[in-house]
Amino acid sequence: MISSPIRILGIDPGLRRTGWGVLEIDGNRLMFVGCGSVETREHMALASRLLAIHAGLGAVLDQFRPSEAAIEQTFVNKDGVATLKLGQARGVAMLAPALFGIAVAEYAPNQVKKTVVGAGHADKAQIQAMLKILLPKADPKSADAADALAIAITHAHHRKSAALAARMKAVG
């Protein structure tokens, strides 16, 4: 049985910059498709910033037509207001693929780092170095786009167990 390539959208949510990365998996091969970021300005009203994130990701979904999506889980920091705003951006970022009928898998930051680099406490430079090895055609212009590609790679490696867990959760 020949399977067709699967296209995955990785999302690194943020209110200032939401990174996105698209790759395809064909068997064990990872292929870079595209990456970038949706940027908002601090002077914009919160609702306008959230709308810009939604519209930007909607355009990415229209252009690249992924069949699966993954997003990084939010960590809680000492600044409650910043955490809340990040959560709002993350919610909008999850809504965009959901409106296209695409389930969104979630991965902890340490799991992304461990999958891509082999260490759960890797820094951004280590992640970017491994991206050059895993996806040599990728040239992310921002750390957010690089992180989004790392999230997509993580999903490519864990997608079968994530799908099984989602089915088990739905069954109850």
Curated annotation (Swiss-Prot):
EC number(s) recorded for this UniProt protein: 3.1.21.10
Enzyme active site: D12, E72, D144
Annotated CDD domains: RuvC (cd16962)
Reactions the enzyme catalyzes: Endonucleolytic cleavage at a junction such as a reciprocal single-stranded crossover between two homologous DNA duplexes (Holliday junction)
Subcellular location as annotated: Cytoplasm
Xref: Pfam families: RuvC
Amino acids binding Mg(2+) 1: D12, D144
The family this protein is said to belong to: Belongs to the RuvC family.
General function of this protein: The RuvA-RuvB-RuvC complex processes Holliday junction (HJ) DNA during genetic recombination and DNA repair. Endonuclease that resolves HJ intermediates. Cleaves cruciform DNA by making single-stranded nicks across the HJ at symmetrical positions within the homologous arms, yielding a 5'-phosphate and a 3'-hydroxyl group; requires a central core of homology in the junction. The consensus cleavage sequence is 5'-(A/T)TT(C/G)-3'. Cleavage occurs on the 3'-side of the TT dinucleotide at the point of strand exchange.
Protein name, as recorded: Crossover junction endodeoxyribonuclease RuvC
Gene name of this polypeptide: ruvC
